[in-house]
């Protein structure tokens, strides 16, 4: 497994390969999936965290079933640009996942993704209980959509 930049990913992806987005939390892992044309990110049900080994098994089974080509994982950078404990935990998660899969991981700045997801769910008039259930996957979808938009721009620039 390697960590790639979004530019490196753009060079290695084949047509019709899907990408998964992850929002790593302490209790859940938000999950989103791209379509095969890599234009749209769709939230998927969250993964309830148990222990790393079980979390990894669930994530890798999902990746195999959905034929995931890469993971875009939100990197929780502080507003001042520094990396706090959550960013360190995310990097440690990716390092440990690297021992279990050859799939590449791409870090994506997730600043304000949860705020944007919360706002979108509020605009859709989703109840407080349902918002709590869906917020992590909605945030994963925002993270993935940002990466997909960047991939699209890189592809257009290369043509």
Swiss-Prot record:
Assigned EC number: 3.1.-.-
Keywords: Cytoplasm, Hydrolase, Nuclease, Ribosome biogenesis
CDD domains: YqgF
UniProt protein name: Putative pre-16S rRNA nuclease
Family annotation (InterPro entries): RNaseH-like_sf (IPR012337), YqgF (IPR005227), YqgF/RNaseH-like_dom (IPR006641), YqgF/RNaseH-like_dom_sf (IPR037027)
Family: Belongs to the YqgF nuclease family.
Record keyword Methyltransferase present: no
Protein purpose: Could be a nuclease involved in processing of the 5'-end of pre-16S rRNA.
Coiled-coil regions, chain positions: none
Subcellular location: Cytoplasm
The organism of origin for this protein: Agrobacterium fabrum (strain C58 / ATCC 33970) (Agrobacterium tumefaciens (strain C58))
Keyword rRNA-binding found: no
GO molecular function, one term: nuclease activity
GO aspect biological process, one term: rRNA 5'-end processing
Any GO CC annotation of this UniProt entry: cytosol
SMART domains found in the cross-reference section: YqgFc (SM00732)
EC top class named in words: hydrolase
UniProt superkingdom: Bacteria
């Amino acid at each position: 497994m390697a960590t790639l930049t979004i530019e490196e990913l753009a060079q290695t992806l084949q047509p019709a390969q899907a990408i998964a987005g992850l929002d790593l939390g302490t209790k859940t892992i938000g999950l989103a999936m791209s379509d095969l044309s890599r234009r749209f990110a769709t939230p998927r049900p969250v993964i309830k965290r148990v222990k790393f080994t079980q979390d990894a098994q669930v994530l890798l089974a999902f990746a195999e079933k959905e034929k995931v080509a890469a993971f875009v994982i939100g990197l929780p950078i502080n507003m001042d640009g520094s990396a706090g404990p959550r960013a360190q935990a995310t990097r440690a998660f990716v390092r440990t996942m690297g021992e279990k899969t050859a799939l590449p991981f791409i870090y994506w700045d997730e600043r304000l993704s949860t705020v944007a997801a919360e706002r979108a769910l509020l605009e859709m008039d989703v109840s407080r209980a349902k918002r709590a259930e869906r917020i992590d996957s909605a945030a994963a979808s925002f993270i993935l959509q940002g990466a997909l938009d960047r991939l699209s721009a890189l592809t257009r620039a290369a043509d």
